[in-house]
C-alpha cells in the first residue's frame, strides 16, 4: 500500500452488486467505481469517478492489482478467488482484496488482510453497510498481537527475517509464552477493546527477561541488536523500531 490515501476500487459484476455499489459509493467518495458497461448508466450522479469495462472482468484484474490498494468486489467469494488466483504474488506486494455478497450481508477480507490492510478496511466497510465482517486471520480472531504490523499506525518499523515473523506469529496465536519488551516508543500500541492476552508478559528492559521461559521475544527498542543475539535466539526474536520523536 502507498503512504498516501489508499486507492480504492468498488467493483460490481452483477445487477445486484451494482445496486450495492451505487448505495455505498456516495459514502466513500474517494473510491472509484468499476462496473460493466451495461451498469454504467445506473451510476450516473455519483460523486465518485466511474469507469466501465466491456467483455470479461478477468481481463481487468491485472490493471486493478496495479492501480489500487484496496479492491472491493461485490460478488461471490468463489468467483473472486478464481479471478485473482493467477495474479497473486506475495502479501508484501498484493493489494487488499475484500468481497461483499450481493445482499451486502457479509464483508470478507480475502487477500492481504494485515499487510495490505484488508481486514481493517473490511471492518470499516461492514460498519457502513450494517453488515457482518468475516475475519479469519488468527490474530484477529484470537484478539492477540499482529506481529507483522504491530505499531504500524505509530510509525514503528519491523526488523526481523521473514522466518522470524512467521515463527513468532505462530507462537503468539498458539498462546505460547511471549515476552514483550518496550524500551522506547509510544505506549498506546494495544488498540483492541479486549485485555492483552495472558500469554504475553510486558517488560521494560530486555535484561529482565528470562529467555528460557519464553518461546519468543518482541522487543521495541533503539538499541543495536548484536548479531550474536539474533543467532542465540535463532527464530524467536522480532525487533520494532519506533520513530525518534517518540518517547
Language-model region placement:
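Extreme N-terminal starter segment of soluble prokaryotic enzymes
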Residues: 4-9
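Conserved mixed alpha/beta catalytic, RNA-binding, or beta-rich assembly cores of soluble enzyme
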Residues: 11-41, 46, 51-56, 60, ...
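N-terminal targeting/anchoring "stem" of glycan-biosynthesis enzymes
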Residues: 2-3, 26
Amino acid at each position: 500500500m502507498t503512504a498516501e490515501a489508499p486507492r480504492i476500487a468498488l467493483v460490481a459484476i452483477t445487477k445486484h452488486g451494482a445496486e450495492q455499489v451505487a448505495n455505498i459509493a456516495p459514502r466513500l467518495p474517494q473510491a472509484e467505481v468499476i462496473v460493466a458497461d451495461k451498469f454504467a448508466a445506473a451510476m450516473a450522479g455519483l460523486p465518485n469517478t466511474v469507469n466501465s469495462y466491456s467483455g470479461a472482468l478477468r481481463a481487468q484484474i491485472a490493471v486493478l492489482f496495479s492501480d489500487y490498494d484496496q479492491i472491493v468486489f461485490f460478488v461471490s467469494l468463489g468467483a473472486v478467488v478464481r479471478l485473482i488466483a493467477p495474479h497473486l504474488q506475495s502479501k508484501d506486494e498484493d493489494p487488499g482484496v475484500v468481497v461483499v455478497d450481493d445482499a451486502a450481508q457479509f464483508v470478507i477480507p480475502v487477500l492481504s488482510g494485515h499487510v495490505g490492510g484488508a481486514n481493517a478496511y473490511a471492518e470499516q466497510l461492514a460498519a457502513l453497510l450494517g453488515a457482518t465482517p468475516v475475519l479469519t486471520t488468527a490474530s484477529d480472531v484470537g484478539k492477540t498481537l499482529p506481529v507483522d504490523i504491530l505499531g504500524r499506525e505509530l510509525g514503528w518499523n519491523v526488523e526481523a527475517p521473514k522466518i522470524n515473523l512467521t515463527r513468532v506469529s505462530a507462537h503468539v496465536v498458539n498462546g505460547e509464552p511471549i515476552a514483550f519488551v518496550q524500551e522506547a516508543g509510544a505506549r498506546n500500541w494495544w488498540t483492541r477493546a479486549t485485555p492483552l492476552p495472558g500469554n504475553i508478559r510486558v517488560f521494560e528492559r530486555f535484561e529482565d527477561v528470562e529467555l528460557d521461559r519464553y518461546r519468543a521475544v518482541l522487543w521495541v527498542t533503539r538499541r543495536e541488536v548484536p548479531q550474536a543475539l539474533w543467532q542465540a535466539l535463532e527464530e524467536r526474536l522480532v525487533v520494532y523500531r519506533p520513530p525518534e520523536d517518540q518517547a
